[in-house]
Amino acid sequence: MSEKTSIERLRERHRSARHGIGLRRPHFDALLEGAPGIDFFEVIAENTMTIGGRTRAVVDALAERFPIVVHGVNLSLAGPDPFAGEYLDALEGLIERIDPPWFSDHLTYSRAFGVEYHDLIPFPFSRAGLDRVTERVLYVKERFGRPFLVENSSYYAAFPAAELSEARFLCELVERTGCGLLLDVNNVYVNAVNHGYDPYEFIDTLPARAVVQIHMAGHDDSGTFLVDTHGARAIEPRSEERRVGKECAT
């Protein structure tokens, strides 16, 4: 049975998990009392995997009542350095503890030549880059043994070395690895405005069967370009959501 089919089965299995929110400390008390209309939660791996105290207690308590998915920012999927062993061990501990139906990270890097950037750094969508990311995604899937999603990211400069569009890069990555996609519609919009492409064409290019989760967030307008800050209200997402079907978690 192909890995592509496993992502389709994942969508079917969790089709009732329609609407989720990011789990944040200011909401702990209210969520412990009740979470009407919320089907699942998302935790940031780096804010959760080595933290004890109340944060750990609340995450563990909610994990008994709701699915909790894990979203990372520091896996450095596209990086030239080997994966950080301590990071992988800590991530593995979190995943084993809360048993997420899937986990995810960005199509970026955050570590290179021994330097930690603590940011999501874009890279050229080249054939060599595709080979490197393919190898690393396959390693992550094998090590953790559960569905893994890759998120499209925002970027603010075009790379002359790029040989593929971002959408085509993601399509080929899905075909090569059987990974799922976490579609960030705000990142699509920000990139489309900044780089002058059609966001609907981008979304239509992606394999809808691979889109398991959708992120919706806001951005800031500098006057000359948009910046993905998650610091403003999300723009209307519903038309984009309909384009990739109704079986995705948002």
Language model features with spans:
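Distinct, well-ordered alpha-helical segments
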Residues: F28-E33, F159-E175, N191-D204
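A short alpha/beta connector and helix-capping loop motif
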Residues: V59-R65, A192-H219
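Active-site beta-loop-alpha junctions enriched in small/polar residues
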Residues: R24-P26, I44-E46, V73-S76, L107-T108, ...
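N-terminal pre-domain/capping segments
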Residues: M1-G93
